[in-house]
């Protein structure tokens, strides 16, 4: 291997020293050391044998190194020796008649050496390594270094596959031009406080590539010789069962996906003229590039995986499609949009599979996982290329890339690779923003008086930057800002003024993300209140509408209906995805969604062209995406309601949970279909026996189990100036069928006043006249008391169809006429007694 480093120069000095010594007699078996000592350097010379067995070509390499190393410097021990030594292999031309030589140099001897300035080094360069010589291919055939099942071996067309048909560039919107920053925004370094205070569009960072710094990429599958490149970015997404690694450099990209459950895949992009070499026994010898399509005008893509057109057609098609991404325009936002599209389809497959949190990935979701990982790598590469070409990167671009990378990485790990909630995401982009532990007060804009909803969008953009550059332990200032965003959305929801457009959905997601995984008691209380309000906004009606929204997105994104330009996962985000409602997959909700499909003309027309089972399957998958398996998993629930999982008796133990309602510190209500093991349980009366409802109050780590009765008494009506008697209580509306319709928090005095007004309330959720006459309601107090709300407890009014009424009236008239005729006939057939008058006397 020819290395442009000082180690090669030192090795040349050692070679000159060895060349000046008397030549030793050649011969003898490999491993028999031949000493040639030097008083100054204590150098040993020996021969290393490569290959073994009569059927394998055996050859020797002349080695020079410190005294004593010859006893362990065998070919099988090279990887262990590299920790303490630098191995330099000098590969000379076969025609020169000179032998190859390997030098072992102690790393301590070159600690202070600087890299040699060798001009005209390619940005991407392959290093064939010790076994690059032609005679070593027979050794590789022993499968000592590579498992050839990772790549197709024959026939040739499975190795050099053609590109998949990519979307026409004419169908894509042209990339938006990069904003030219003003000189005033040029800073050498800034942190997130500056971005929050003045906006990310006002800052940019000058960037350049350090061409003296190089790294060597070693493929996970040991199928490609190490590639030297100039690094510019890196990301690692990993958990205990899978990992995705992204390495970005000047003109270079590598994306590898490894998993205990899925087939491996590595996607590489290099300049079209780069000489990337494969380690393989294909055709018995020679240097071949990795599998992939023909080179494009500027770059070439390689895909290393398992599968061909006969063994695994789905994997083969995935490899072809991933390879086609390399020739698309270098627009990082376009790649991110495509990644969101694939991530949505991946979430849909995972929701349809209904697997547990540690059951592994859904089979059909894996093919989308490869595509998402490739798109993330290309987005990081595209931004890097554009920034280096222009000499700067905008803070807005860094925020965009980092928040998309973090969001899509979590989805990729959970839904695509089957990871539990403890997955890790580590990234290093071309420029980083420092993240201080505390945010300055001036980082937040004041809320305009009387314009809370308008400021929600602006505050949501600030929380987006917090999400991009903060870890799971967001600063307290960010949590307070997030709590205010959710509170304003909740107030608008209670007034019936909230419209769920994309800006509101994005703001809600970033607020929930900033509140998740609290680190102390104050943060926990803020997070529980955020979740209570998300649960309240997830009414049965909203869940139905949100499921229909997801079905329409699937019809556009996955069904070929078009219209998915600029799509993001957060465009379909719903408060149900961050709520404690766990009943959205029940049959009643699925039927509600199916019955509401005709109201969406485009969706109804698309489903008409699908098989009969498509509608119920799509509805069930959409409701599954709304549940806890989407963007926030079971770990989120465990962090916000620890009292349900921390008891020594083994948790609360209820089956078929409907909802969790935190009401006080270390206390929660759990609505279930079955009797739990602990807590104070209320069984609601008048509910369908096949779909019962039980309300259990669970406090702390208590394992006591008891039963209580729902109180049916008239609630006091507090005056507008009285203390808030019902603040912190939760209003629950349900039906005799067992369906829970609303779970609403009474958070302040104004909400309490509207609740007390009953049928005169201006808040639709509290007005019984605006709901079915069959509705029932109860109030859950923070102290564990459950009271029936009498305003919703009136007798059920019978309803009759007009035809039934007219038929009943006609029947009554006929019956009355018949009875009258019979009575008259009976009266005429019975003789009547006649009276006699006195006889006159004549």
Curated annotation (Swiss-Prot):
Residues making up the signal peptide according to the UniProt record: 1-20
GO CC terms: host cell endosome membrane; host cell plasma membrane; membrane; viral envelope; virion membrane
Statement: the UniProt record of this protein carries the keyword Signal: yes
PTM comment text: N-glycosylated, O-glycosylated, and sialylated.
Protein topology in the membrane: Single-pass type I membrane protein
Residues spanning the membrane: 803-823
Annotated stretches, region: Interaction with gL: 240-303
GO biological process: fusion of virus membrane with host plasma membrane; symbiont entry into host cell
Keyword Transport: no
Major localisation: virion
Keyword terms: Fusion of virus membrane with host cell membrane, Fusion of virus membrane with host membrane, Glycoprotein, Host cell membrane, Host endosome, Host membrane, Membrane, Sialic acid, Signal, Transmembrane, Transmembrane helix, Viral envelope protein, Viral penetration into host cytoplasm, Virion, Virus entry into host cell
Disulphide bond pairs: none
Highest taxon above the source species: Viruses
Intravirion topological domain residue ranges: 824-842
Location(s), subcellular: Virion membrane; Host cell membrane; Host endosome membrane
Virion surface-facing ranges: 21-802
Coiled coil: none
Entry-listed glycosylation sites: 77, 112, 617, 666, 760, 783
Family: Belongs to the herpesviridae glycoprotein H family.
Subunit structure: Interacts with glycoprotein L (gL); this interaction is necessary for the correct processing and cell surface expression of gH. The heterodimer gH/gL seems to interact with gB trimers during fusion.
Described purpose of this protein according to its UniProt entry: The heterodimer glycoprotein H-glycoprotein L is required for the fusion of viral and plasma membranes leading to virus entry into the host cell. Following initial binding to host receptor, membrane fusion is mediated by the fusion machinery composed of gB and the heterodimer gH/gL. May also be involved in the fusion between the virion envelope and the outer nuclear membrane during virion morphogenesis.
Name of this protein: Envelope glycoprotein H
């Amino acid at each position: 291997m020819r290395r442009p480093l000082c180690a090669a120069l030192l090795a040349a000095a050692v070679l000159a020293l060895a060349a000046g010594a008397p030549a030793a007699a050649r011969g003898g078996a490999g491993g028999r050391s031949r000493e040639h000592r030097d008083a100054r350097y204590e150098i040993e010379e020996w021969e290393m044998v490569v290959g073994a067995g009569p059927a394998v070509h055996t050859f020797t390499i002349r080695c020079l190194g410190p005294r004593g190393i010859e006893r362990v410097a065998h070919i099988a021990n090279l990887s262990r020796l590299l920790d303490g030594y630098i191995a330099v292999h000098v590969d000379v031309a076969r025609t020169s008649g000179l032998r190859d030589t390997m030098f072992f140099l102690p790393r301590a001897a070159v600690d202070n050496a600087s890299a040699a300035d060798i001009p005209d080094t390619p940005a991407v360069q392959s290093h064939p390594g010790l076994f690059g010589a032609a005679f070593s291919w027979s050794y590789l055939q022993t499968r000592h270094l590579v498992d050839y099942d990772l790549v197709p071996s024959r026939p040739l067309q499975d190795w050099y596959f053609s590109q998949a048909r990519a979307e026409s560039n004419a169908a894509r919107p042209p990339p938006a031009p990069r904003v030219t920053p003003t000189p005033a925004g040029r800073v050498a370094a800034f942190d997130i406080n500056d971005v929050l205070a003045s906006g990310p569009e006002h800052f940019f960072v000058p960037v350049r590539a350090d061409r003296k710094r190089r790294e060597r990429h070693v493929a996970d599958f040991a199928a490609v010789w190490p590639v030297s490149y100039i690094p510019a970015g890196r990301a690692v997404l990993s958990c205990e069962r899978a990992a995705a690694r992204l390495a970005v450099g000047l003109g270079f990209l590598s994306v590898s996906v490894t998993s205990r459950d899925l087939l491996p895949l590595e996607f590489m992009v290099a300049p079209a003229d780069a000489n990337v070499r494969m380690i393989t026994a294909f055709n018995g010898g020679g240097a071949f590039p990795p599998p992939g399509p023909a080179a494009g005008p500027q770059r070439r893509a390689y895909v290393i995986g398992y599968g061909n057109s006969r063994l695994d057609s789905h994997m083969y098609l995935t490899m072809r499609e991933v390879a086609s991404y390399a020739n698309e325009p270098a627009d990082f936002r376009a790649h991110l949009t495509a990644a969101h599209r694939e991530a949505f389809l991946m979430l849909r497959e995972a929701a349809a599979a209904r697997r547990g949190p540690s059951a592994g990935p859904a089979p059909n979701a894996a093919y989308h996982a490869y595509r998402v990982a490739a798109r993330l790598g290309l987005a990081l590469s595209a931004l890097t290329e554009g920034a280096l070409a222009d000499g700067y990167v905008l803070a807005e671009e860094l925020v965009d890339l980092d928040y998309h990378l973090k969001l899509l990485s979590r989805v990729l790990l959970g839904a695509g690779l089957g990871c539990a909630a403890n997955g890790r995401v580590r990234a290093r982009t071309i420029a980083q923003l420092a993240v201080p532990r505390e945010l300055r007060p001036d980082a937040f804009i004041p809320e305009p008086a009387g314009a809370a909803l308008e400021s929600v969008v602006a505050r949501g953009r600030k929380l987006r930057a917090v999400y991009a550059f903060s870890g799971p332990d967001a600063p307290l200032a960010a949590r307070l800002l997030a709590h205010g965003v959710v509170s304003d959305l909740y107030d608008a929801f209670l007034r019936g003024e909230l419209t769920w457009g994309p800006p509101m959905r994005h703001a809600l997601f970033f607020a929930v993300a900033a509140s998740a995984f609290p680190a102390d008691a104050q943060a926990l209380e803020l997070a529980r209140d955020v979740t209570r309000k998300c649960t309240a906004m997830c009414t049965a009606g909203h869940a139905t509408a949100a499921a229909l929204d997801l079905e329409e997105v699937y019809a556009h994104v996955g069904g070929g209906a078009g219209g998915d330009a600029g799509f993001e996962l957060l465009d379909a985000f719903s408060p149900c995805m961050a709520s404690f409602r766990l009943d959205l997959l029940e049959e009643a909700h699925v039927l509600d969604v199916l019955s509401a499909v005709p109201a969406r003309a485009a969706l109804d027309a698309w489903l008409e062209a699908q098989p009969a089972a498509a509608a119920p399957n799509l509805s069930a998958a959409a409701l599954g995406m709304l549940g806890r398996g989407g963007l926030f998993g079971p770990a989120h629930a465990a962090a916000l309601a620890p009292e349900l999982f921390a008891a020594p008796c083994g948790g609360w133990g209820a089956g078929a949970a409907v909802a969790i309602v935190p009401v006080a510190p270390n206390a929660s209500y759990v609505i279930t279909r079955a009797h739990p093991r602990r807590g104070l349980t209320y069984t609601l009366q008048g509910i369908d026996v096949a779909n019962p409802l039980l309300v259990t109050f669970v406090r702390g780590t208590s394992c006591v189990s008891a039963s209580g009765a729902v109180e049916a008494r008239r609630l006091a009506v507090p005056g507008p100036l009285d203390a808030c008697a019902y603040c912190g209580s939760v209003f629950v509306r349900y039906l005799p069928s067992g369906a829970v319709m609303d779970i609403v928090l009474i958070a302040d005095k104004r909400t309490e006043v509207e609740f007390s007004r009953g049928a005169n309330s201006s808040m639709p959720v509290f007005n019984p006249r605006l709901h079915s006459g069959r509705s029932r309601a109860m109030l859950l107090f923070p102290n564990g008391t459950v009271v029936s709300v009498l305003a919703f407890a009136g007798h059920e009014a019978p309803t009759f169809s007009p035809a039934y009424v007219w038929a009943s009236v006609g029947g009554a008239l006929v019956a009355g006429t018949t009875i009258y005729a019979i009575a008259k006939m009976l009266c005429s057939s019975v003789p009547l007694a006649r009276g006699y008058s006195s006889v006159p006397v004549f």
